[in-house]
Curated annotation (Swiss-Prot):
SMART domains: HDc (SM00471). HAMAP family: dGTPase_type1. One of its GO terms (molecular function) is magnesium ion binding. This is Deoxyguanosinetriphosphate triphosphohydrolase. Homotetramer.
Length: 505
């Protein structure tokens, strides 16, 4: 296996206007500080204030949004990164791994990847994703492109429907239909950073948020060697060339992951498991005492000095013993969080170090906190209790169903733009208003300028005399609608749906 040298991975160059020449340690750190400023000041980060973590449209500011969750993930990611670097320093391996002058960038990349990890999520979280994918599947039927005779293709879009004697074009149609019907928050995050926001981040910083390595247009089984890394779509056809360049710049083999992404993933796993339970108590779904009993009974096998007793039991006893300065709820979650971090962060750091050859190569086919250890079992305990007692709560399920309906309804409302012929839509884009299409003109005007410009830029580069042009134009038109609706906050999507459905003025 090739030697481990992080100087080959922490690539501080950019896609555009990249700094030139050999850089000192301080100059390289300044480049990543520039990344930090671009990310923190981006509208995509600000919109996380009004996007769902667990409870959509929540007015209680104590309950987490995507932004507060991401800030917590950022802190845990920094903690894990520092723990890794500290242990490598104790072992005199920083210089061996090319990290002696890159500890600052190492930490910064992890922190900002953690802060950005949810920026591509649509309104209403996973139910928003499901609504987008279900809506497009009902119209494009990507499964028909694989298993049905051409005459049985139910795709309602003529330019994407399979045709006899057009094998090469049909392959592109299959690819496009599959891609459009696999909207995914992580893939949308890559699209936001590169295509829509044009943030021009360093290659290493973008590599940190490429969580999954499967293209959205992938058809068929994934290789066992990359089953975990490819379990979800990680990028779209629209970013294919950019990802190819990213892989080259970061020396990543096909379908492999950037090393620091494992740290971001572990930080997210640790953060949301405790946070979801705390938010449920804040929402009065259950009390702290009820939560403790849920956790206790779900653990099953209890022994003195077990991990459960050291983490959960200890938090419960301390919160009951000290009620002078804080509420029992505050005390319990403070101790639970501290105990959880003190156990899981060192374990995640050591797992990173122990598996560094595979992680550096990008082929470690599991999460850091996904193994047969008690630490993994503790995380699963938190997740299972949340699934059984939080996500299945009637109030949560009702809000999720409402969110699904809002996103589906908005797609119904903007559907006329997808029904226009290629020539009519091209004319509408050029003139912005057409008298013969009053509804479509008004809908087009409502689209974000940023999203419209992204569509115009990419379509203007397509050869209009090519047989692929109608297929690819429609693909980017679908991306335009998905970009706009997925970029809404929960509250904006809710209000926009009610306004356009004439529920309120």
């Amino acid at each position: 296996m090739a030697s481990i040298d992080f100087r080959n991975k922490i690539n501080w160059h950019r896609r555009y206007r990249s700094p030139q020449g050999v850089k000192t340690e301080h100059e390289i750190l300044r480049i990543f500080e520039s990344d930090r400023g671009r990310i923190i000041n981006s509208p995509a980060i600000r919109r996380l204030q009004q996007k769902t973590q667990v409870f959509p449209l929540e007015r209680n500011a104590a309950v987490r949004t995507r932004l507060t969750h991401s800030m917590e993930v950022q802190q845990v990611g920094r903690y894990i990164a520092k723990e890794i670097l500290s242990r490598l320093k104790e072992q005199d391996r920083l210089e061996e791994y090319g990290l002696d002058a890159l500890t600052g960038p190492f930490e910064s990349i992890v922190e900002m990847a953690c802060l950005m990890h949810d920026i591509g999520n649509p309104p209403f979280g996973h139910f928003g994703e499901a609504a987008i994918n279900d809506w497009f599947r009902q119209r494009l039927h990507p499964e028909d492109a694989e298993s049905q005779p051409l005459t049985h293709d139910r795709c309602v879009v003529s330019s994407l429907r399979l045709q006899e004697g057009e094998e090469n074009l049909n392959d592109i149609r299959r690819k496009v239909r599959q891609d459009i019907c696999h909207f995914e928050g992580n893939a949308q995050g890559i699209r936001l950073v590169h295509t829509l926001m044009r943030m021009n981040l360093t290659w290493a910083q973008v590599g940190g948020i490429l969580k999954y390595t499967r293209p959205a247009w992938w058809r068929g089984p994934v290789p066992d060697s990359h089953r975990y890394l490819m379990k979800k779509p990680g990028y779209y056809l629209s970013e294919e060339k950019y990802i190819a360049r990213l892989r080259k710049e970061l020396q990543l083999a096909p379908y492999s992951r950037f090393p620091l992404t494992w740290i971001m993933e572990a930080a997210d796993d640790i953060s949301y498991c405790v946070a979801d339970l705390e938010d449920a108590v804040e929402k009065r779904i259950f009390s702290v005492e009820q939560l403790y009993h849920h956790l206790y009974h779900a653990w099953c096998h209890h022994e003195k000095d077990s991990l459960f007793e050291l983490v959960v039991g200890n938090a419960w006893e301390k919160s009951r013993a000290n009620t002078l300065s804080r509420s029992t709820e505050d005390q319990f979650f403070m101790y639970l969080r501290v105990n959880t971090l003190n156990k899981l962060v060192p374990y995640a750091a050591q797992r990173f170090i122990d598996n560094l050859p595979q992680i550096f190569a990008g082929t470690f086919n599991q999460a850091l906190l996904e193994d047969a250890s008690g630490f993994s079992r503790l995380l699963e305990l938190y997740k299972n209790v949340a699934v059984e007692h939080v996500f299945s709560h009637p109030d949560v399920e009702q809000l999720e169903l409402q969110g699904y309906r809002v996103i589906s309804g908005l797609l119904d409302i903007y559907q006329p733009l997808l029904s226009l012929s290629l020539n009519d839509f091209r004319e509408l884009v050029e003139k912005e208003r057409l008298k013969r299409f009053p509804i479509e003109s008004r809908l087009f005007q409502k689209l974000s300028t940023r999203h419209r410009l992204a569509y115009v830029e990419v379509v203007s580069k397509l050869p209009t005399d090519s047989a692929e042009y109608p297929v690819l134009e429609y693909y980017y038109r679908c991306r335009l609608i998905q970009d706009y609706i997925s970029g809404m906050t929960d509250l904006y999507a809710w209000d926009e749906y009610r306004r356009l459905m004439a529920v309120e003025q």
